[in-house]
């Protein structure tokens, strides 16, 4: 197959010829060709300073790069924690069956569809999530698969491109506003379509109302969600809306101008009044309305304190004016008052003093004191220093950083700029994972706006301080969240961690002192500088100050993005904010801190959420993924899931992580298959400790945590697996499906069974062929009489 | 800080220069911290993690950790050793290949059979002789009478016939006699003659005297090994000729001249024979004890009354010895062979003689007596059909080569053809492999983590490099050397995590990747992943 090498030439010409151009070049090639053709790669070697060994090494390291052509349509199945506990494996199996993908392959024989797993799409509250092409589907089930594929193909055939919500010219009509949350998970639930429908209805109605894009609203469990804000009437929230409701909603709130519209409004209100919902209780769009005084909404919001997410649901993410109008860049201006390039001023030290005094610690996981980190970088000799915003939020089950970048790009830019000024850096990089395209887009757009404004580049905020900011898109490697691996990645290398010391603060990017802070940490900085360190330090516990943003997901009623003061208990988060687990289920544990964290059992739920308390339990604060588990979650399976993840994401450099996690995973797989012996369990425990002690970087050192904590708190479940039982009835090899006497012979299970394991026997009790049964759970879900039992 | 400072390793202070690593400091103290991925020129690569030490409660690689003033390092502790051993065991769990070929592992005397066969194949008979003599006492006898367990393990046998290993020993020893080649290393007239083979003597530490009672297979084998260790050995036997039970073998199976020639080899090595002398009056254990530093009883199967005469504790009709040290309750009296446990196979009786020799040798050197350690070997297990086929492709096809003249045995050419059937499934780096070395030192268990292994793969390149990816431990030295030498193609890590492999870019061959630094990469490979083809194979 010959390819057009001119495209390669163009990309090289645009991106550059230095070694560090490698990853962007490969990203460009993949975008153009759909994969990385060898001829193109060889051409890259000829045209640039990049060595063939680097090209092969890097192209085979990162998940996003493909060395073989793929199907026309890419189906990405999210395998994040929340998706895993919600049954992503079953959805993937259904997709593969439906799309006729042979086992062991990822693409069907006609080259139409490629199904691949993706570490985490960061839409955890919509789990399980599947992305087909650019369309994201939330709350998927095996039964919905055919419908999803149909819907996707229909959108492709009709060329009905969903309008982008990114290039909006926002008209400021003044007066009333309708706020539509347009984070990527809201969009996955159709808020972009709703946005367009509302905008259309609003303009039909006449210009008295502005439909405004805002960032994350936090209440992911109720999206798409909008807020109608009217100066005279206060605000009303609507949840779970669809585009079909747009007109009725606009007309309910806003009086149209012309006669025709007026008549139409009256007519639609009559129609709306006739609509009954299933329960017959409320009518029309009114049934979607909720008040902020609603007990559920209050429980969700009352305990929260919004600092990193200040003005959530109110700000247009890309409106510089709005950001400035709400106190944006005040803090940066203050810091810049006397800053000049090349000279340290007392003000710079004052900034670091404030950060130190605030007690803020790194929100990326380890909780290193931020001020101290800044001071080390500031004290390093040399002119050239770098600041990096770590937006490689790789933990499955975490999406705080994505949401902050998507909703408050200017805030993070301000935080990074303050850090740059404080340590004396003139170049900053946003490292954002490519799985977050909207975050990348918005940060780029925000930087561009600031540059146009003359606020970035040679004159930061118009002063004499030069600061250049750029965005580096990650290429899909969890390990790049580790600072030294992240730096290697920016330098165009495989993302392999290095031994520390030397720390990046001493020898970082290009060997220069480099400050790396997490997105959330930087988002806190402007608030601290604006409101004072004391005010920040007044929130939280003795050693853990301020707030923490959590992605609350899993087996919980009100999932979403929350920001709570440090010291809030796990129980308050799960039961009050999240509303607890589903009725009839038992709250069993929370998985906190992702693959490096651990499982805290429900009996320890009164533990305060702060760095030390969580560490004492064997978990870590982590970046803030908080996945709630109930009695249907198998803890051995959870441990296996995380080991699978870390093993898959290990860079492969050091022995303990590369081989040790593999051997641990093998034992866990044996356990889940009911084939493990006591010796295996003992070896698992011994090896877990040794992998933790002997690995080179944080990824390997913390990889055994999910195993160690589940062994510590749920040993009985391991014991049960040794005896061949899975108490949560999750491990496929240890369970059996059968149909009891309640079966009425309705045949629904037989019709839905994807593998024909249930012969159709109308009006008599059905039987499941255990050999054919794949434990996909479909029959149990569809049975109207709860006659399907799992043993 | 540009002045030297000191750090403490296992309680011992050592002075270091600024910038020096903990590893460098430990070497100054003479500590042997194992390293696989460290090469000074490449700087610390920090991949193997076997050089771990404990500092401030944390395990860190010593090669990449710079010494800092006042640092307290733990190196030779149980905990640190356990971590190093685990690292080695993890590496072995993903290390595909045998250090030692199955035939060698099955040989009670550990003859390096594949090397012998490569010499024969290439017509290097003196070298083949040296290889045999290095391991086997009475090689000519074994070439005729050995029950050749080696051939049962030969992988070639999985395909057609095993290599005729015993026959090759016979060919070499017959050649020695017919050509007048003297396999003894002891040169006449004090000077080594050009035509004599390489020395198989190891220099004496301090001359000690040993009396061996019994000139059967066990006693002669012990005499052979003890003489090689530099001890003065006297073999006593009641018969007029040395050989013990070997003298009873029909001459069709073992002609007397063969046995005589083998005993002559021992004589040339310096073994004294005192024949026709029976233990009893006047030769007593007490008397021998006054004249010799150690006594080894290898008198063969004992009758009840004979045993009583020795006045040593018995278990049934056998002498009671410590199974680990071959020692009887009498000081400096050892016993081995059929007088301790009846041995039916000659080579096993000789292996007992070898074990006893090692016990005696250690005793004479003032060390605790113990049997020789089993050499460490990674074990690949049975080959699957595809792997076997790949091996067969790289060797001479066809079943075993029978000699034209059955009585005369294989000619040199026939022997070469038969030897060419060897699959060379041994590791070329065995004995020269850092991984194997430290596995032995640390008592690593190559099978601690049992799991499905990767497929064995051997890429024999036209230019003479053999690459066996399954043996690569991803130390990164070759990748780094290529980078430093700006190889036009070079080698790269390909893939991520457990699946990472070292390969040339764009699926090219290893040899094309190594245009400048092939020699260096082969020399520095810590395992047998990169080796050169040896003369006589492929």
What does each model-identified segment do?
Chain B
Residues 2-185, 192, 197-204, 294-334, ...:
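Ferredoxin-type iron-sulfur electron-transfer modules and their immediate structural context
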Residues 29, 229, 269, 288-291, ...:
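Conserved dinucleotide-binding and phosphotransfer motif residues
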Residues 42-43, 242-243, 281-283, 498:
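Short secondary-structure capping/turn micro-motifs that flank functional sites
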Residues 120, 162-166, 212-281, 392-404, ...:
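Beta1-alpha1 glycine-rich phosphate/pyrophosphate-binding loop at the start
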Residues 120, 124-127, 204, 209-211, ...:
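Feature captures the FAD/FMN-dependent oxidoreductase FAD-binding
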Residues 180, 200-207, 243-254:
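Accessory recognition modules or surfaces
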Residues 222, 245, 284-285, 306-308, ...:
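Short glycine-/acidic-enriched loop or helix-start segments at secondary-structure transitions
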């Amino acid at each position: 197959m010959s390819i057009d090498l001119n495209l390669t030439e163009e990309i090289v010409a645009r991106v550059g010829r230095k070694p560090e151009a490698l990853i962007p070049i490969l990203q460009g090639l993949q975008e153009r060709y759909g994969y990385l053709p060898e001829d193109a790669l060889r051409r890259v070697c000829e045209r640039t300073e990049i060595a063939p060994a680097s090209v092969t090494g890097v192209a085979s390291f990162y998940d996003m790069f493909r060395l073989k052509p793929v199907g026309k349509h890419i189906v990405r199945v999210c395998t994040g924690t929340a998706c895993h506990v919600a049954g992503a494996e079953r959805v993937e199996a259904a997709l593969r069956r439906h799309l006729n993908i042979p086992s062991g392959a990822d693409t069907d024989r006609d080259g139409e569809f490629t199904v691949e797993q993706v570490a985490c799409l960061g839409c955890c509250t919509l789990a399980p999530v599947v992305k087909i092409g650019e369309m994201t589907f939330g709350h998927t089930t095996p039964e919905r698969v055919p419908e999803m594929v149909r819907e996707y193909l229909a959108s492709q055939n009709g060329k009905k491109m969903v309008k982008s919500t990114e290039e909006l010219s926002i008209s400021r009509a003044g007066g009333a506003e309708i706020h539509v949350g347009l984070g990527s998970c809201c969009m996955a639930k159709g808020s972009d379509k709703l946005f367009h429908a509302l905008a259309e209805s609003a303009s039909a109605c006449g210009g008295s109302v502005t439909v405004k894009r805002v960032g994350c609203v936090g209440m992911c469990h109720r999206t798409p969600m909008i807020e109608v804000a009217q100066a005279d009437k206060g605000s009303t929230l609507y949840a779970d809306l669809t585009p079909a409701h747009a007109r009725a909603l606009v007309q309910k709130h806003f009086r149209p101008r012309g006669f025709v519209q007026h008549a139409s409004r009256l007519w639609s209100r009559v129609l709306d009044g006739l609509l009954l919902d299933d329960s017959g209780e409320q009518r029309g769009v009114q049934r979607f309305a909720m008040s902020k005084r609603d007990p559920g909404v209050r429980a969700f919001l009352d305990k929260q304190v919004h600092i990193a997410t200040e003005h959530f649901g109110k700000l247009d993410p890309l409106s510089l004016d709005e950001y400035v109008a709400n106190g944006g860049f005040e803090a940066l201006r203050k810091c810049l008052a006397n800053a000049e390039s090349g000279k340290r001023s007392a003000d710079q030290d004052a900034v670091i003093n404030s950060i130190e005094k605030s007690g803020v610690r790194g929100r990326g996981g380890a909780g290193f004191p931020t001020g101290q980190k800044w001071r080390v970088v500031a004290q390093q000799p040399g002119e050239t220093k770098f600041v990096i915003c770590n937006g490689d939020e790789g933990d499955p089950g975490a999406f705080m950083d994505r949401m902050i970048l998507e909703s408050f790009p200017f805030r993070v830019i301000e935080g990074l700029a303050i850090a740059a000024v404080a340590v004396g850096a003139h170049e900053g990089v946003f490292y954002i994972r490519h799985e977050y395209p909207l975050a990348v887009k918005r940060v780029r757009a925000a930087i561009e706006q600031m540059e146009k404004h003359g606020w970035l580049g040679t004159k930061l905020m118009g002063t004499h301080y030069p600061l250049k900011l750029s965005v580096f898109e990650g290429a899909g490697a969890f390990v790049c969240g580790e600072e030294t691996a992240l730096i290697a990645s920016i330098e165009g290398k495989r993302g392999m961690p290095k031994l520390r010391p030397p720390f990046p603060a001493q020898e970082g990017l290009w060997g220069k002192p480099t400050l790396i802070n997490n997105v959330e940490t930087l988002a806190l900085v402007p608030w601290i500088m604006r409101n004072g360190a004391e005010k920040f330090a007044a929130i939280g516990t003795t050693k853990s100050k301020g707030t923490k943003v959590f992605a609350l997901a899993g087996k919980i009623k009100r999932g979403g993005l929350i920001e709570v003061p440090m010291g809030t208990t796990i129980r308050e988060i799960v039961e009050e904010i999240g509303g607890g687990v589903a009725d009839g289920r038992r709250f069993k544990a929370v998985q906190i801190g992702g693959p490096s964290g651990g499982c805290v059992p429900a009996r320890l739920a009164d533990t305060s959420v702060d760095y030390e308390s969580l560490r004492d339990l064997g978990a870590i604060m982590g970046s803030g993924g908080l996945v709630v588990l109930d009695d249907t979650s198998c803890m051995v399976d959870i441990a296996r899931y995380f080991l699978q993840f870390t093993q898959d994401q290990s860079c492969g450099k050091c022995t303990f992580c590369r081989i040790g996690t593999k051997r641990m995973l093998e034992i866990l797989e044996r356990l889940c298959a009911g084939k493990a012996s006591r010796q295996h369990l003992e070896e698992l425990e011994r090896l877990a400790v040794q992998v933790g002690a002997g690995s080179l970087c944080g990824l390997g050192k913390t990889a055994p945590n999910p195993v160690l904590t589940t062994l510590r708190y749920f040993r009985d479940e391991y014991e049960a697996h040794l005896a061949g039982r899975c108490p949560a009835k999750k491990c496929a090899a240890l369970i059996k499906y059968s149909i009891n006497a309640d079966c009425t012979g309705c045949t629904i299970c037989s019709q839905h069974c994807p593998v024909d394991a249930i012969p159709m026997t109308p009006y008599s009790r059905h039987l499941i062929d255990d050999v054919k049964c794949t434990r996909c759970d479909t029959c149990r879900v569809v049975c109207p009489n709860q006659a399907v039992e799992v043993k | 800080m540009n002045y030297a400072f000191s750090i403490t390793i296992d309680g011992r202070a050592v002075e270091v220069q600024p910038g020096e690593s903990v590893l460098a400091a430990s070497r100054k103290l003479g500590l042997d911290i194992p390293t696989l991925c460290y090469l000074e020129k490449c700087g610390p690569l920090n991949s193997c993690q076997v050089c771990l030490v404990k500092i401030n409660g944390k395990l860190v690689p010593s090669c990449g950790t710079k010494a800092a003033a006042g640092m307290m390092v733990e190196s030779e502790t149980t905990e640190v050793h356990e971590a190093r051993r685990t690292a080695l065991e993890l590496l072995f769990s993903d290390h595909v290949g045998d250090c030692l070929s199955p035939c060698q592992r099955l040989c009670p005397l550990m003859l390096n059979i594949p090397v012998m066969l490569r010499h024969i194949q290439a017509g290097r008979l003196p070298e083949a002789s040296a290889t045999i003599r290095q391991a086997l006492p009475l090689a000519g006898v074994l070439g005729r009478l050995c029950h050749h367990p080696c051939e049962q393990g030969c992988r070639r046998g999985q395909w057609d016939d095993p290599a005729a290993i015993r026959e090759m020993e016979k060919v070499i020893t017959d050649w020695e006699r017919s050509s007048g080649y003297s396999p003894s290393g002891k040169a006449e007239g004090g000077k080594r003659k050009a035509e004599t083979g390489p020395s198989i003597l190891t220099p004496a530490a301090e001359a000690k005297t040993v009396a061996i009672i019994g000139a059967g297979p066990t006693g002669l084998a012990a005499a052979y090994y003890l003489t090689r260790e530099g001890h003065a050995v006297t073999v006593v036997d009641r018969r007029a000729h040395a050989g013990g039970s070997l003298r009873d073998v029909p001459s069709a199976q073992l002609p007397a001249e063969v046995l005589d020639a083998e005993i002559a080899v021992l004589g040339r090595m310096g073994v004294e024979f005192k024949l026709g002398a029976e233990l009893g009056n006047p030769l007593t254990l007490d008397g021998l004890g006054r004249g010799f530093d150690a006594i080894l009883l290898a008198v063969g199967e004992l009758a009840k009354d004979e045993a009583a005469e020795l006045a040593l504790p018995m278990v049934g009709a056998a002498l009671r010895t410590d199974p680990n040290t071959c020692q009887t309750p009498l000081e400096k009296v050892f016993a081995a062979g059929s007088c301790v446990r009846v041995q039916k196979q000659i080579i096993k009786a000789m292996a007992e003689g070898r074990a006893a020799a090692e016990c005696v040798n250690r005793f004479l050197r003032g060390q605790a007596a113990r049997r020789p350690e089993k050499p460490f070997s990674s074990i690949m297990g049975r080959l699957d059909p595809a792997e076997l086929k790949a091996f067969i492709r790289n060797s001479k096809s066809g079943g075993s080569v029978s000699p034209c003249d059955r009585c005369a045995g294989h000619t040199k050419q026939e022997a070469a053809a038969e030897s060419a059937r060897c699959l060379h499934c041994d590791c070329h780096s065995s004995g020269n492999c850092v991984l194997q070395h430290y596995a032995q030192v640390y008592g690593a268990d190559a099978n601690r983590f049992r799991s499905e292994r990767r497929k064995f793969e051997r890429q024999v390149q036209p230019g003479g490099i053999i690459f066996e990816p399954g043996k690569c431990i991803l130390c990164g030295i070759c990748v780094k050397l290529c980078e430093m030498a700006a190889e036009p193609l070079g080698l790269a890590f390909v893939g991520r995590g457990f699946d990472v492999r070292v390969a040339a870019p764009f699926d090219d061959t290893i040899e094309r990747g190594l245009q400048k630094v092939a020699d260096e990469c082969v020399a520095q490979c810590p395992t047998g992943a990169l080796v050169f083809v040896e003369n006589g194979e492929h």
